[in-house]
Structure formats: structure tokens, C-alpha cells
């Protein structure tokens, strides 16, 4: 898979996407890095620790989050993306489901669009990604948790997302998929997805797994968000053992 100027050997390696939320309210690091200097310092820490991709988020996607305007999100993410582009030779992802934000981020230097709605929230998102031939991570998500056959339904939903990408002209080697742990799923469904996360690979694209500090871990271990490091590591290793090419 090609992201920016780098080729990722997704069949033989697992790569790390480092989270950098420039938000006041993200549940894992909200408020810590919402100044340019603090964000840049954290990016340097991640680079020193071997991160392969920076993932920049300007709006929290935690349960109950408050949606912000496109303009405010752009004001949050564009300065840090532009700065990272000049400081590091590391691909940059923008975590957004809004096409206006994605386009501004790409123009500032983003190499990948990480869309938690898999092209289904903003009908112009696929067009923007195709226009710039940017890489994309397309996540499974739903507004409800009503499934007939959970794993099969998730695969069918992702097939719809892939079709949207293809219709827009997004090339196969620009696509990765995310099973969407913690999004549109109950606690039990999240556990089942962890058990069968390798099923996502049958669709023919690299898979990204993101479990960092999520409620599934908290409910299993009865721990608050700031004490879920070990659970995050365990679920990440499970994903690696099951063939995930990227972990977030």
C-alpha cells in the first residue's frame, strides 16, 4: 500500500499509526496537545518511538461528543499538519468524516484520510479522496446496533463502502479497512469482532485495528480510560496475530 511517498509492505509487517488529537475533549488525550507547540512535542516523541504514520484528529469521536463546524476543525488540524510536513518524513493521516476538512488537510500535506463513516456520512468525501488520489482508511460504522448476522453484516457494510470508493475512482492500493471497534456495536459485538477480525482481510485490503483505551477494554477490566494501557497492548497484539497490517 502506498501512503504519501512511502510504500508499506502490508503482507509481512504491522505498522503503527500514532494518535495526535488536537482537541479539548477526546477521551484518551483530549486537551493535552491542542496547542501547536504541545502537539509538535508529542509528535517528536512518537517519531523517536518509531511511529509509522501520524493520525491528526480535530474533533473528538468519543461517545456523546459535540460536533464542531468544518471551519473550526480546519483551524485545529491544518496548522499542525503543515508543521509536521516540514519537520518529519512520516506520512500524515487526518481523522475526519467531512470532505471540506479532508480537502483542506490534504492541501496542507495530509497523505491519508481516516474516515470513521467509511464514505457514508459525507457524499463528497469519496470524490475528494479520488481527486487527490490520497490513501484512505475506511471504517465500519452504523447509527444502530441492529444486525441479523453480525460478522456477515459488517462485511456487507464494508463491501458497500468499497463500492463507493471504486465508483469514485479511488485505486485499490490506496484503501485500508477498519472494523470499527467501539462504533455501532455493543460490548459483546466488539469482543466478537476481535475474535473474528481476520475475516475483514477476506475483502482483499489491508486492515487497521484501533482499540486504544476503548470502552471494550474498560468494561472487561473495570478500568477508567487512563488505566487501559495493558488492555490496549493485549488487544493490539491479538490484532497483529490475526494479520492486521496497521494498529492505531
Predicted regions and their residues:
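Phosphate/pyrophosphate-binding loops at sites that engage ATP/ADP/AMP, CoA/4′-phosphopantetheine
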Residues: 44-48, 159-174
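Conserved, well-structured ligand/cofactor-binding cores
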Residues: 16, 21, 26, 54, ...
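N-terminal binding-site loop/beta-alpha segment at the start of enzyme catalytic domains
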Residues: 9, 16-40, 48
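Catalytic domains of carbohydrate-active enzymes, especially glycoside hydrolases
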Residues: 41-57, 243
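Active-site-adjacent loop and "lid" segments of alpha/beta metabolic enzymes
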Residues: 3-5, 28-37, 41-42, 61-83, ...
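Active-site loop-to-helix "anion-binding N-cap" substructures in soluble metabolic enzymes
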Residues: 1, 9, 46, 51-53, ...
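N-terminal amphipathic alpha-helix/helix-capping segment at the start of soluble metabolic enzymes
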Residues: 1-24, 166-170, 223
Amino acid at each position: 500500500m502506498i501512503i504519501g511517498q512511502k510504500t508499506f509492505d502490508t503482507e509481512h509487517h504491522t505498522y503503527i499509526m500514532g494518535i495526535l488529537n488536537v482537541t479539548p475533549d477526546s477521551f484518551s488525550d483530549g486537551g493535552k496537545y491542542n496547542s501547536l507547540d504541545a502537539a509538535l512535542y508529542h509528535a517528536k516523541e512518537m517519531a523517536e518511538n518509531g511511529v509509522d504514520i501520524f493520525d491528526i484528529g480535530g474533533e473528538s469521536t468519543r461517545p456523546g461528543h459535540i460536533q464542531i463546524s468544518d471551519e473550526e476543525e480546519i483551524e485545529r488540524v491544518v496548522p499542525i499538519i503543515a508543521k509536521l510536513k516540514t519537520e518529519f518524513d512520516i506520512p500524515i493521516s487526518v481523522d475526519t468524516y467531512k470532505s471540506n476538512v479532508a480537502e483542506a488537510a490534504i492541501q496542507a500535506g495530509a497523505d491519508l484520510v481516516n474516515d470513521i463513516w467509511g464514505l457514508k456520512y459525507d457524499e463528497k468525501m469519496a470524490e475528494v479522496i479520488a481527486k487527490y488520489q490520497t490513501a484512505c482508511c475506511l471504517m465500519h460504522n452504523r447509527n444502530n446496533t441492529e444486525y441479523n448476522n453480525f460478522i456477515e453484516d459488517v462485511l456487507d457494510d464494508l463491501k458497500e463502502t468499497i463500492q463507493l470508493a471504486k465508483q469514485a475512482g479511488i485505486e485499490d492500493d490506496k484503501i485500508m479497512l477498519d472494523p470499527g471497534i467501539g462504533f455501532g456495536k455493543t460490548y459483546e459485538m466488539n469482543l466478537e469482532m476481535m475474535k473474528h477480525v481476520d475475516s475483514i482481510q477476506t475483502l482483499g485490503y489491508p486492515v487497521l485495528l484501533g482499540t486504544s483505551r476503548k470502552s471494550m477494554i474498560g468494561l472487561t477490566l473495570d478500568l477508567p480510560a487512563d488505566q487501559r494501557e495493558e488492555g490496549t497492548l493485549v488487544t493490539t497484539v491479538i490484532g497483529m496475530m490475526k494479520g492486521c497490517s496497521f494498529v492505531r
